[in-house]
Amino acid sequence: MIILNKQYELFSSRVKSLLNRIYKAAVIDDLIEKLFSLLEPHLGESDKEDFDKWSENNVLLITYGNSIYSEKDNSPLTTLDRFLNKYLIDTITGVHILPFFPYSSDDGFAVVDYLAVNPELGNWQDIQRISSQFNLMVDLVVNHVSSHSQWFEQFKQGIQPGCDYFIEVNADLDISDVVRPRSTPLLVKVDTANGAKHVWATFSPDQIDVDFSNPDVLLEFIKIILFYVQSGARYIRLDAVGFLWKKVGTPCIHLQETHAIIRLFREILQMIDPAIALITETNVPNRENLSYFGNRNEAHMIYNFSLPPLLLNALLQGRSEHLKTWMMSMPPAPIGCAYFNFIASHDGIGLRPAEGLLDRDEYTALLETMKKFGGEISMRKHSGKAESPYEINISLFDALKGTVKGEDSWQIQRFLCAQTIMMSLEGIPAFYIHSLLATHNDHEKVNQTGHKRSINRHTWDYEKLEKQLNDPLSHHSMVLKELCRLIQIRRRQKAFHPNATQYTLHPLNQALFAFWRQSITRDQSIFSVHNLSDQPQDLRLTDLNLVSTDAWIDLISGDKFEDLHDVYILQPYQSVWITNKFDSAAEENLPSCYYVCE
């Protein structure tokens, strides 16, 4: 029965064209009715686009629910909440808690039950307590489910609804065109009540891809989105979404149906709560990644995946040219959209986003240096038996323990320089918990799990961590203290709004990486300049074109610039934020920076 009212007609007009891009015409009207019945109780009073989703104040933490644990607490999520309130309450505004659901592998990304909290981590009350103080990012693992999930058990038994939720193919199907992020077999043989079948598994034999060509699968995931929003999510992260739609004879990545489904998700969130942001995780070459902004009608945010490998290479080489070339090629994020900046996460440092951006010699030197610093290289499979490097698995702190020349004594300064560059760029900054804590490679965990990614997934005992953080000479303490200070300074600068103007500067010194940020209201400028090398470097202030009628100060060190024709000496890996607008009261109490402490 068709529901004849204005609200339904408006809803239909907004989703029908998108559904027509995904499904056959025969199922569209029925699907619209089901969608409307599902969403009607949740439709908001206003669905006007919220252009104030973010500001310079937004900073996120990326963490597992059990990255820190304590025997004294009831659950790891309770410990996380305790840590956040003690150390980061004035520093971050949002928390991405990596998949906290029951799972069977891949540290949470093989979800058994989307609607439950893993009891080993805590419960929904723990999640909601954190979301009441911080903007919560929740993963929608949209491409696949665990082979131990109820849906897949139903598939094996041949019962509804799961029997229709997965992709069955012939074992001899030509899959040579399919883009692979892993080296495991794409097709997995499964014994079912109806005999042996082969199903699609992009990431691993335990992660079985769901079949979005079945509209009921779409409805299931929209129900999950609604549940996450009701549970406090302010960001919905679409994990591995680029692989969502499969079509034989294509690469099965970035297909038009995938883009249409993302647009549909955005449209639905817009109708439910315009303040919620959708973020896509597509670890692919830069041009492909940018396509997920669509025509400002797909993702609100995309990961800046090219930044980690390019910034790492720049600091290893001590030169800025590749960073500058990349930055000049990056378009400003569309209105209502933003880049999600990071240089470390639970995964490795992706290499595909650096394709075409580094020359062969530097690419080789990057991989060899990371191996020397204790890192591992993960591979992906091409057609046939060929493999190529996919990501570097290493703690970022250890990745920056030296340069291509070898280890040196500048690890902390180099690491802080990397983080300062990241938080200065156009976009919203996100810090992996093991970056804030300057955690070393965890080789013991790699040996325990047999997985290379475990090297950067250390689990801290809270009491042992506190002992380190209470020691002013501990590198963990020094890094956390200085990063918190820098983040708090950054959050007060309008020129660091995620959509504030960004312009690449070209000082004659290639060891310097410099860019200009200007606030949306055009009343604050910040010249963000960074020494990428292990030697002092001259910065000619005339290269920056500082307006002579303004007073200029470095927000990081407190240094004032009175002679605009002077030469300022940047110490190894030093960063400066030279601005014409600052809080004089805050300036008087400006803490000394790490270089002064040294």
Question: PLM features: residue spans?
Answer:
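Active-site and adjacent substrate-binding regions of carbohydrate-active enzymes
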Residues: I2-E598
